[in-house]
Amino acid sequence: MIILNTQGIVLKAIRYKESDIILTLFTRKLGKVSAIAKGAKKNKSSLLSSSQLFSYSNFTLKKQGNMYKVTQSEIIKSFYNISYDIEAFSYATYITKLVENSILENQTNNRLFILLAQTLYLYTQDNTDNRFITAAFELKFLDYIGFKPIVNKCINCECKILQNSVFNIYEGGILCSKCSKLFDNNIKLDLTTISLMEYVLRNDILTCSKAKVSKYITHELEDILDKYLKVYVDNINFKSLHVLQSVKNNKGVDNDE
């Protein structure tokens, strides 16, 4: 019988039978696992709060067949107020779906775990620019799953003169003005956007959250990452992307610097 303690974040919570919940957890020690929280739907259950979507908790898990059973849990951060803000909820749902659909069972990724926990925390803060933070999450997520775009030098000749450079999704990064003539499907990006991408990749997301980014640059970053994700992430959830895009459209975008 395997029993272990690990920190975990609830990526999905599905009601099972009358009072149980089947959880998809992203954990530090086990990666993504399925676990059943018996009786968690009961009002007096000690597992109720830690079985809610986005909850970040210490879990005691016991191996049972193909899944685990939650025998004990203690909340670290509930992130409960995300559910009361439609915008924050939409962004949080999107990034948890992105993680859930992009990592394998029992595959650990502690950098991604910390990134997810910190991003959920930022969604609970009143002064967070959710659009920029979500784009920053996407960029760092791509790095942590092995698809980091190269933005600090030309991917072809490694020259670091990026004036008049372009971005090529299929080549995986920046092409200098000379090398851009050798490739198709280039996308022109503002040099500020390229510099911002380098900044995000170099710093943790809590540091990135302090940056003041214009709506125009945020929109350009969102657009290029949307295209990049669709090429490199096989199981991207298009339904959650559609919901997220509706939220963005309702917010509107202007070209103010």
From Swiss-Prot:
GO terms for cellular component: bacterial nucleoid. Keywords: DNA damage, DNA recombination, DNA repair. InterPro entries: ARFGAP/RecO, DNA_rep/recomb_RecO_N, NA-bd_OB-fold, RecO, RecO_C. It holds the Pfam family RecO_N. HAMAP family: RecO. Involved in DNA repair and RecF pathway recombination. PANTHER family: DNA REPAIR PROTEIN RECO (PTHR33991:SF1). NCBIfam families: reco. This is DNA repair protein RecO.
